[in-house]
Design a protein with these regions (language model features):
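Short, intrinsically disordered low-complexity segments
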Residues: 1-2, 31
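Sec-dependent signal peptide recognition
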Residues: 2-9
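Acidic/proline-rich low-complexity IDRs
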Residues: 9-10, 44
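N-terminal or membrane-proximal amphipathic helix/coiled-coil initiation segments that transition from
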Residues: 10-13, 93
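C-terminal motif of bacterial Sec signal peptides marking the signal peptidase cleavage site
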Residues: 15-18
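Bacterial signal peptide processing site
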Residues: 20-23
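Mature extracytoplasmic or organellar-lumen-exposed domains after removal of signal/transit peptides
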Residues: 25-418
Length: 418
């Protein structure tokens, strides 16, 4: 009896705690201040980056300062951009190897789990590259090709319902059902790796219960192969001495990889800023603007996008369908890694503020305009902190705010940006 009373007491406490915890969770989801703070932090970071560029652009730079700034660009090209894309290529290959050409009767949970782990590794590296989308990623439309969202589930269902086991190049052209987000849908549900049983039978997602897992595996194989080619394209586009095997894959796929004006690499292009016969950047300042503060494809560009689109569209504007990475629950991680891409560029290495690079914007501003530099660095740290403080998962946060289930949210068409 005593034991029963003790257990009952524990049960009562557990129920009370569970209810209290559930209430607290709901209250947090209903609290708009978290999203507002994250958007405000991104706005401050964008402003700080613009101020930093203006400080350089308006300065009467000495020759020593110009040399240091060029060294910073060289460091960013080699140690941030090329290295990020190389590691991204490695992770994409890992994902491809995990799934391979396995059929539904051959695949194991280990295959799925390994593919999911490689997906998250690749996803982190891709999000860590979004501060430097200016260049190959935008010139060759690689960014929209491998990272368009929301996923067009209706169109994807049409493809999968056709029962195809292979896909032509022409059929792999609609970016709304390709890249990371198509793979995310196939590999993850409700923030969890999918169970192998689904791939051996039928999907369980609303509207997809007539789709066989083996059909999804065949489609995933085609999408991964396409993704691998395009991340290789990013890598060899920036390398002055490209990896021979990856270059061959890019050439075999008929993909572009050189700057049109000079037929040189994008790394070479950045390193020769100011030499109009060797670079698309007529001045050193123009190259720095592209890295730090252009409205698109720069550090400021991705800070703006995170605050005014990735967070604002679903959270502030009510377009719940616009949540990025909703199936893996990776949204907040994606947003924070976007800001970390800015951090890597600013500090000149893959480890953010711990990079200790020989040349970096961090060191340049510490020596020449410390208040401006500190403003950027504080804004980076604050943006990451405010983003990571938002209720997890972001898709549930937005769904609660607007009382709309993600799977029921209708796609909203946005005008294409010029």
């Amino acid at each position: 009896m005593r034991k029963f009373i003790y257990s009952a007491a524990l049960f009562a406490v557990a129920v009370f705690t569970s209810c209290s915890s559930s209430d607290d969770e709901y209250n947090k989801y209903a609290d708009r201040s978290y999203g507002i703070s994250a958007m405000s932090a991104c706005s401050e970071l964008s402003t700080a980056l613009n101020v930093a560029y203006s400080e350089i652009n308006n300065a009467n730079l000495t020759e020593a300062q110009k040399t240091e700034l060029q060294n910073i660009l060289d460091k960013i090209a080699d140690d941030v951009i090329v290295e990020t894309y190389k590691q991204l290529g490695d992770a994409a290959v890992e994902m491809q190897d995990a799934l391979g050409t396995l059929k539904s009767d051959e695949i194991s949970q280990e295959n799925i789990d390994n593919a999911c782990a490689a997906f998250k590794k690749a996803r982190k590296l891709w999000e860590n590259s979004e501060a430097f989308l200016g260049g190959a990623a935008s010139d060759f439309d690689i960014d929209p090709h491998i990272d368009s969202w929301p996923l067009n589930r209706d169109l994807l269902h049409q493809y999968l319902a056709s029962g195809k086991s292979d896909y032509t190049d022409e059929q792999m052209e609609d970016a709304t059902i390709l890249g990371f987000h198509a793979l995310e849908f196939i590999l993850f549900r409700n923030g969890q790796n999918r169970k192998v049983a689904e791939f051996q039978g039928y999907d369980t997602y609303k509207g997809f219960t007539d789709i066989k897992g083996e059909t999804e595996l065949a489609y995933a194989e085609a999408v991964i192969a396409d993704l691998v080619n395009h991340v290789f394209e990013l890598q060899v586009s920036w390398q002055e001495n490209p990896d021979a095997n990856r270059l061959k894959a890019v050439q075999d796929a008929g993909l572009d990889y050189l700057v049109a004006k000079t037929s040189k690499s994008y790394g070479y292009n950045l390193k020769h800023a100011g030499n109009s016969s060797e670079s698309t950047f007529g001045t050193l300042e123009a190259a720095i603007q592209q890295i730090l503060s252009r409205t698109e494809g720069s550090c400021r560009g991705i800070s703006d996008e995170v605050g005014t689109k990735k967070i604002a569209n679903p959270f502030a504007n009510g377009d719940v369908s616009y949540v990025e990475s909703p199936y893996s629950y990776n949204s907040i991680t994606d947003f924070a890694n976007n800001i970390r891409s800015i951090e890597n560029v600013w500090y000149g290495g893959m480890n953010g503020s711990s990079s200790n690079a020989t040349y970096s914007f961090h060191k340049f501003f510490a020596e020449n305009s410390s208040a401006v530099g500190k403003r950027v660095e504080n804004a980076i740290a604050d943006a990451i902190a405010k983003i990571e403080a938002m209720p997890y998962p972001f898709v549930n946060y937005c769904s609660t705010i607007w009382n709309v289930k993600f799977e029921d949210a209708e796609l909203v068409e946005y005008p294409e940006e010029e």
